[in-house]
Each structure stands twice: as structure tokens, then as C-alpha cells.
């Protein structure tokens, strides 16, 4: 008999997990559909995106080991998730370990960008990363991202006002077109060159 997979769904904007020591009802999840954003938020309300979890990825693994969680997990789009069992089988643990390794490599890349790249370069890298997620779709042959300036600020470790200036600069230079709650990528090649450029400082 085929075992029915347990799933749960959340709407875009829903908070799935909160910081703190996992409670008895907390679970680890695998993303089946949609995109989950993991963010740390300081006392002033400034957010920093730690990781984007795409379909096939995992989050909330602290619940399996009783470790404290330092982030919020928010549904960036409508999502469908599979809660993991409290005692995963070896194959699932192997998948989880591989995902954690990839997530650690991604975290290293984010730290490197924060330390070595100017904000404009980090923004180009963030836009390209978002273009490969469920937040992206195609209009008239161009990639369009559904993203607010607050979300972009969290993605690059900055604040909304500064990000708005950088978005305006990228638009004037022809890399993107900015609209209400969305960004159209006009020059992917140019954005890739920016993203690969180191720059200095912030």
C-alpha cells in the first residue's frame, strides 16, 4: 500500500517558524511547492535574508536536534510543505545532510559578498538569485521578479532607503526596469558581470 504523504500549506506572507528553542509541536520541513525565506531580524526591525529555500530543500532542522532557532521562516509565495518525521530514515537524513552542506556553502557566499562587494554588486547578485526562484516569471521575453524594496534590502543586508537609490541607479543604467512590487531584468549579461565584480567595501 502506498503511504499517503502528509502535507501542510501556507499563504504568502505567513510566518511558518519563529526564533527560539523549538517546542514540541515544531517540525522540520521539506519544501514541495513555492519558496520559503529564512530571515534574521534585529531589535530595530531590520531584516537579513539568510537563505531562500526552493522546492526540494529543507528548513527547520533544529527541531530534529533540539537546537535554538535564530531566524523566522516566512512563506515568500504560497507554499506546500512536507513535515519530516521525528526520526527520519537514513535516506532522508542523507538528503538533509546534502542540503545542509549546500546551504552552508550558500551562507559562505553571502558572507563573502557582504564583506567584499559594494551594494550595487550585491544587488545584482541578489536579483539573479531571485530570478531562479518561484518569485520570477516571464513577461515579453524578460524575467520579472515579484519583490518589494524591503525584501531586496533584506536580501543584500541594507535598508530600504539605500536600496531604493541603488535600484534607481540600476534602472537608469538600463539593467532593470522597476515597477510597483516588481523588477524587470533587462540586461542579464550586464547583471552577471556586476555580480561577479568584487568592488570594495559597502
UniProtKB/Swiss-Prot annotation:
The record's section on InterPro entries has:
cNMP-bd_dom, cNMP-bd_dom_sf, Env_Response_Regulators, HTH_CRP, RmlC-like_jellyroll, WH-like_DNA-bd_sf, WH_DNA-bd_sf
Q: Where is the HTH crp-type domain?
A: 117-189
Q: Does the keyword RNA-binding apply?
A: no
Briefly explain the null phenotype: Viable, but has growth defects, particularly when grown in a synthetic medium. Increased sensitivity to disulfide stress. Decreased expression of TTHA0986, TTHA0770, TTHA0337, TTHA1028, TTHA0654, TTHA0655, TTHA0769, TTHA0425, TTHA0634, TTHA0635, TTHA0636, TTHA0637, TTHA0638, TTHA0570, TTHA0030, TTHA0460, TTHB243, TTHA1128, TTHA0035, TTHA0520 and TTHA1803 genes.
* Highest rank taxon of the organism: Bacteria
What keywords does the record list, in alphabetical order? DNA-binding, Transcription, Transcription regulation
Q: What's in the GO CC field?
A: cytosol
DNA-binding stretch(es), residue numbering of this chain:
149-168
| A GO MF term | protein homodimerization activity
Q: Give the GO terms filed under biological process for this record.
A: positive regulation of DNA-templated transcription; response to oxidative stress
* Induction / repression: Increased expression during the stationary phase when grown at 70 degrees Celsius. Increased expression during the logarithmic growth phase in oxidative stress and upon treatment with diamide. Increased expression by heavy metal ion, antibiotic, high salt and organic solvent stresses.
Q: What does this protein do?
A: Activates transcription. The consensus DNA-binding site of this transcriptional regulator is 5'-WWGTGAN(5-7)ACACWW-3' in which W is A or T and N is G, A, T or C. Regulated genes include those encoding proteins involved in nutrient and energy supply, redox control and polyadenylation of mRNA.
Subunit field text: Homodimer.
Q: Which PANTHER family match?
A: CRP FAMILY TRANSCRIPTIONAL REGULATORY PROTEIN, HTH-TYPE TRANSCRIPTIONAL REGULATOR ARCR
Please state what the protein is called: Transcriptional regulator SdrP
Amino acid at each position: 500500500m502506498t503511504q499517503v504523504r502528509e502535507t501542510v500549506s501556507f499563504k504568502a506572507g505567513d510566518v511558518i517558524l519563529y526564533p527560539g528553542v523549538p517546542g514540541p509541536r515544531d517540525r522540520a520541513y521539506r519544501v514541495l511547492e513555492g519558496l520559503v525565506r529564512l530571515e534574521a531580524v534585529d531589535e530595530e526591525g531590520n531584516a537579513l535574508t539568510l537563505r531562500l529555500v526552493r522546492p526540494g530543500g529543507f528548513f527547520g532542522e533544529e527541531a530534529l536536534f533540539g537546537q535554538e532557532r535564530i531566524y523566522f521562516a516566512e512563506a515568500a509565495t504560497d507554499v506546500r510543505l512536507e513535515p519530516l518525521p521525528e526520526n527520519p530514515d537514513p535516506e532522508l537524513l542523507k538528503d538533509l545532510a546534502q542540503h545542509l552542506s549546500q546551504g552552508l556553502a550558500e551562507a559562505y557566499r553571502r558572507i563573502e559578498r557582504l564583506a567584499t562587494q559594494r551594494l550595487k554588486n550585491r544587488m545584482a547578485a541578489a536579483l539573479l538569485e531571485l530570478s531562479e526562484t518561484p518569485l520570477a516569471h516571464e513577461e515579453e521575453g524578460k524575467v520579472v521578479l515579484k519583490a518589494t524594496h524591503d525584501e531586496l534590502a533584506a536580501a543584500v543586508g541594507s535598508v530600504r532607503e539605500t536600496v531604493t537609490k541603488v535600484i534607481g541607479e540600476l534602472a537608469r543604467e538600463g539593467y532593470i526596469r522597476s515597477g510597483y512590487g516588481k523588477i524587470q531584468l533587462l540586461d542579464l549579461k550586464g547583471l552577471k558581470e556586476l555580480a561577479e565584480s568584487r568592488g570594495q567595501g559597502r
